[in-house]
Amino acid sequence: MELRFIEHKEAQDERGKYTRDEYRIGNYVVFRELSVYNTGSTFENFGIRANREVDFLPDIYYNYNLFDDDGRTREFKIQTTSYGSLYPNEIQQVIDGYKEAVEVVNVLTDKFLK
């Protein structure tokens, strides 16, 4: 699965510099936002949007936890849900959606978090 770069935007003010890069991967759009403050601190965030025209495609979230043991846990998580009773072809769509989400998370982790 290929992570394709789409667009780069940047802005600056008296507090620092801000960038936003847009990517596409599979049925997802990924926004990587980076803030570099004049104080020397940085903040990174990811927004990941699933294509809502694809049934059973789970949401992916970026988790940045300052309160874990190491103080800086960064990871992507996949939203799970229960759909109740489904037909076999719908179950296959759920499985395919989770497989795609896992693949996307692996690519994003390799590219941005390692």
Each model region followed by its residue ranges:
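Positively charged, low-complexity terminal tracts
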Residues: 1-85, 93, 100-114
